[in-house]
């Protein structure tokens, strides 16, 4: 029996690694996918072999993550419940893809992961595996074997698995960092400063603002301060710059896939900055009809990805919409990073429906007036009529005194 | 011929006041509605009589504005295009109501206002008047008589109407301040510090944060830092406090009713703070189903009000929804005001779907695991199936090796 | 141990009734709620006692069903996936309410029902019970004890429970009849004539049409052919009349709550006729803004009720919208019933936004022309601009040859 | 001065043709685009020259209309306000395209058409011309010169233009026929039989039904009764077959672009049949998530096309969604045409999410039961909690009597 295990090097997956050998007599192949978490991957590999892995894979998927996953999220202004940039949610399908690749290559019929039965990640892992490799068995030991933290701690000690005493549960990738547990579970209490690593406090942020200019092509960031660069590089740089100014902290009440509400805290300096800039550029370059409809498309996209429905055909259809719409989203946006704020202070674009409009605006100024009259009349006709009827008021004056008066003026 | 004129005391309406007497021989009754603009109303009255008004009305509608208009906007999280709290838009129907009251009382058949033919306010004024008093004639001299700024200036000089040299066009009420014109028309340029009056710059904001706690009942703010107060008072206080911390500046590209895109700059310290707090409390107290649907209801409400469709029956229907939903929105939210940021750092409520959930969460922890399994399976069934079919992969294994193995473990 | 059982008198619930006594030693109280199914309720009572019920309740809830459930469905134009009038789905929460009433009165801590684990009704029963009586245990023997049809048949024979040989599984109430099973499970095969009881085939329908006129007040049917009557009576009559003309057969692919697609066949003569009439009257009396938004509200309402979320706060909020909107839905609609067709051929209303419009239409005819010009210009401005920009075409002609020419004509 | 005129050969456009020569001294080039209207095109050409056209174009665009316009409408299930298949609305942008082609080829700077200022077509013509040829002047003589019917009649008589005495105003193309005017303007009166030409009355329809089977590929009809054919041919045949059975009459209240409600009557046998079949096949082949969202996309598409916003970027974005979604819409649908009814009685597809489901359904039958339990619990968790809290009921029983009892049974 061969099992592929998504291995982070932490307590849960180390215990599982050991346990699956012990209880199932399985050969376990460990896989660590690098999506930008700040880990020591050599140490993780060491651990994997130490705890009995027959083979270990380290897969650097950072660039793939930026190009094929984060890129789509930016175009979709992806903020689940208007707040969470989906960092963890976005990385899960990529990790699943890698696990399945290894499982197929290694002839393993079982894929295991360390998710509990209470969170969102089990939904993302399990549905991803079912989609990509329906013939695989999914093994979710924490849930299926009802492993409790206490039991795990004891088991770990027995088997020489190092047990950290950290209070918070962290997940990280280039698109953001999520912090759970401890005092954060009480939504009435302000998150203590110690939970943050990527962002400084407003107090410690520089007194002077810093301006960054982001260039977009087809809705995708392609340059920073005039310098062309790959999305991965741009995100890494922006995480640093914006984080230094305290930008990107998020604290809100979130509805998990499984129906539970929970208080969630994130840091996502690049994500917050880029999505603000992107949304602003859309307002300049997209028609009001596209903006209005795209906001529905965008939230549905976020909802699907958050809830593990990455492989649902609806995602591709939504992207069919988004890719077409984004063709006009070209230009540059300047963001001022200052004391926790990311403020868009300037934007320009060859596709601006604004600049051109300004030109024609002047041209219109002589006859625009009559245009508006007709517009208002027809635009509001039904509403006015309905209100009048409901309140029993009716227009009676066909011949108005003013018309005559105005004529004399003309 | 009697005309009721919405009179601000500024250049446009002073010119119109004079002009309507001169050209139409009209008796003009001026009306100034106080919705919180920081004007000298005695001086305005003086001016009105000086330029020939036969009668002047000053109407203090601040409390009515807070209770019947702003209140609804808070419950609807009203932000047009996710940015503009509708300050001016909200006040227009109230002003119209007052104009109509005066027109009826004074037997005037004509209502005049100073809007141009290019903006949003003409839509709001004209549709409001048509709804409330369809028998009235609407006179919009700037548009109908094609008055240009230059012509107005000259006319003003001739008639002793004072001409200010201010660059920006301002509209103010308790819910916000809008600034237009001058360099702001170029969306690529950062708004100069001089345009702001209600908010200090981040630089000048205090180094220490200030916490405010807002209490809500049925979605409406009812207390500040534990002290019960009327909405009007609460807003006025919060404008001051939040403004002092540089909170509430808005700068975005906006789609006007008439189809033009324009760059708009606002200050709205209380509005920004209260809507953030309100949205956060909704996440704690409303089910995910209500939150998701209400976001559609909310944006439609904002769209209607922005576009002058206050009297459209749809607004009342949307409020039917909102009022029912808001019954659960009770509790307190703590906001940290600091260097331009308004950060929600704590929330509590007897209606929290979170706290109770935490309790039951624990209870569930023993059997939740199987619940999630069934949930994931059925929740993702169609998506997985569709993906498998499309990619020609099919689940084949009915009898799995793992099931047997697991049994031995149990 | 006392159990309240939802008892239909059929095989499943009779087996359960017996089994719960035998296996659990329970005292079982049977409840049959009459929502218009064409059953012999005395016989059902006899059976209940025969198979060991300690007490039997027959509850006539037909009028309550019409007034408090069907009434809301009509106002919401309730058609799940544009097809199914929700007959069964609507009745479930009412039945649950009655079960809970009995359970509380009789001091029973357990409520049992005969649903399988594959359908929609288990969702509706279980969520309803959890909402109304969370302290109650829910017993769903077919699912929990894995009862198969074969096992049930054998058990029934052993215990003298009559076993019918009917192929189809039927559920009926005043709002419709659903037919499942047998050949209907193959969606490529036309439903055989034998499955229908409430509607004649088109062949056997009368050669001559029949006109019915339905009067509505606030969106609710209140009269038939000019005669005022209660909704229950109106529905019963209309089921007969429309059914006689072959109106009301439905055959479509439906997405069940649990994720399965299934082919469903229904008969609902009154429902189909009334909803058509109601929708038509809405088009006459509601503004286009309300119609457009209400269609979203309506489908969400249907979705909630279909999926057993009757007690979800969102339903009440949607009804807040609907009740407000329906205030204008007054008038009469004439429907022609003929050979399977229900065709709206006439409608009138004092609230018509049409008749009044016709009047003003004439008035407008002299100057409407310029109104439309301005409307079109502003309505289409952004779209035209965006298209021009994208295709590199720009308007260049400011002074047109035609303008001069036209002037000479004027 | 050269003018290109959209010429139908009817009274309006013949009068305009003459008038533009007379009043403007213009050279007029007439263009008749054949989109399937049942006209004598040779006679129209004769007339054009007789009334002074310097050149006449007859352009057969039927196939282009089917392939590039109707095709998209089918994929979008296009029914404006759930009723109107957009026949006229769809043809307008194609006609505009042809007019612009001719104008450019012939060096004409003006494009003229015969629309009044009250209807929808002016919006479609004018916005189309502005998009495709912004440098062109648009001449809309009926509106701009305020031509009344009486004046036109007199003018026609004077200039030998034949005046018909038909009561109804007709517009026709392969996708449908619209009938306006006369008694139809009273929405309370049933349309008289004489207005229909493409469909027989139910009375005269055959006593026996006729089955047609329509094959779809990527959402587009490609075969009729097993025979592959081009969409144009398929539509023409189906218009005949379905029309013969009285299928395709539409009568509803419609909201025009300009805000007026009007009663509209259409015949569209192929459109009604194909859209029904297409929608049914979608239910079989698309996931519930896609179906739900696509219904929003579809109505927005119809809304845009109805309102003349064919060139709005949003249309292309919506089609990006639709084209992706429709990849799964392959298969065959059988429709029974009978006495005015078009009833889908069978459907099959290799992409069916139903047939496969049936297979797996069986597989699930042993453990599905527990899956549903978990699903229901989590699916309804928040709703139940919210209801309980609101009504002050709380679950208290942690240890239930039944659990013990059930255990003894297992």
Curated annotation (Swiss-Prot), chains A, B, C, D:
EC assignment: 6.3.4.5
Family annotation (InterPro entries): Arginosuc_syn_C, Arginosuc_syn_N, Arginosuc_synth, Arginosuc_synth_CS, Arginosuc_synth_type_1_subfam, AS_cat/multimer_dom_body, Rossmann-like_a/b/a_fold
Transmembrane feature ranges: none
Main location group: cytoplasm
Primary enzyme class: ligase
Pfam families the UniProt entry points to: Arginosuc_syn_C (PF20979), Arginosuc_synth (PF00764)
One GO CC annotation: cytoplasm
Residues the record lists as binding L-aspartate: 116, 120-121
Catalysed reaction equations from the record: L-citrulline + L-aspartate + ATP = 2-(N(omega)-L-arginino)succinate + AMP + diphosphate + H(+)
Keywords: Amino-acid biosynthesis, Arginine biosynthesis, ATP-binding, Cytoplasm, Ligase, Nucleotide-binding
Biological process annotations from GO: argininosuccinate metabolic process; L-arginine biosynthetic process; urea cycle
GO function term, MF aspect, one: ATP binding
Entry binding sites for L-citrulline: 84, 120, 124, 169, 178, 254, 266
Subcellular localization: Cytoplasm
SUPFAM superfamilies found in the cross-reference section: Adenine nucleotide alpha hydrolases-like, Argininosuccinate synthetase, C-terminal domain
CDD domains per the UniProt record, alphabetical: ASS
Binding positions (ATP): 6-14, 114
Domain of life (superkingdom): Archaea
Biological pathway: Amino-acid biosynthesis; L-arginine biosynthesis; L-arginine from L-ornithine and carbamoyl phosphate: step 2/3
S-S bridge residues: none
Assembly behavior: Homotetramer.
HAMAP family membership: Arg_succ_synth_type1
Family: Belongs to the argininosuccinate synthase family. Type 1 subfamily.
Name listed for the protein in its UniProt record: Argininosuccinate synthase
GN (gene name): argG
């Amino acid at each position: 029996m061969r099992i592929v295990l998504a291995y982070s090097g932490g307590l849960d997956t180390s215990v599982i690694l050991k346990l699956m050998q012990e209880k199932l007599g399985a050969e376990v192949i460990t896989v660590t996918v690098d999506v930008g978490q700040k880990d020591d991957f050599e140490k993780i590999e060491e651990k994997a072999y130490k705890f009995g892995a027959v083979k270990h894979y380290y897969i650097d998927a950072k660039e793939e993550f930026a190009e094929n996953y984060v890129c789509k999220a930016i175009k979709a202004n992806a903020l689940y419940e208007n707040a969470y940039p989906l960092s963890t949610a976005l990385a899960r399908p990529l990790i699943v893809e890698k696990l399945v690749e290894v499982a197929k290559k290694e002839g393993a019929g079982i894929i295991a992961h360390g998710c509990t039965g209470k969170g969102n990640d089990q939904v993302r892992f399990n549905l991803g595996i079912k989609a990509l490799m329906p013939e695989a068995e999914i093994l979710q030991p924490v849930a299926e074997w009802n492993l409790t933290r206490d039991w795990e701690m004891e088991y770990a000690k027995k088997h020489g698995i190092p047990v950290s005493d950290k209070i918070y549960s962290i997940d990280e990738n280039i698109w953001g960092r999520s912090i759970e547990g401890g005092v954060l579970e009480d939504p009435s209490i302000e998150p203590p400063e110690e939970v943050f690593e990527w962002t400084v406090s407003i107090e410690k942020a520089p007194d002077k603002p810093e301006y960054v200019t982001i260039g977009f092509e087809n809705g995708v960031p392609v340059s920073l301060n005039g310098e062309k660069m790959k999305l991965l590089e741009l995100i890494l740089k922006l995480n640093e710059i914006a984080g230094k100014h305290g930008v990107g902290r998020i604290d809100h009440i979130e509805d998990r896939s499984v129906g539970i509400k929970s208080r969630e805290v994130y840091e996502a300096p690049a994500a917050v900055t880029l999505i603000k800039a992107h949304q602003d550029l859309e307002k300049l370059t997209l028609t009001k009809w596209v903006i209005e409809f795209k906001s529905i498309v965008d939230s549905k996209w976020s909802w699907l990805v958050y809830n593990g429905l990455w492989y649902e055909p609806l995602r591709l259809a939504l992207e069919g919409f988004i890719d077409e719409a984004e063709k006009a989203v070209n230009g540059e946006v300047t963001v001022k990073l200052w004391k926790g704020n990311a403020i868009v202070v300037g934007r320009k674009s060859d596709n601006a429906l604004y600049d051109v409009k300004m030109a024609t605006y002047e041209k219109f100024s002589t006859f625009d007036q009559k245009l508006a009259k007709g517009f208002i009349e027809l635009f509001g006709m039904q509403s006015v009529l309905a209100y009048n009827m409901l309140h029993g008021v009716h227009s009676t004056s066909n011949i108005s005194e003013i018309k005559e008066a105005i004529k004399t003026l003309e």
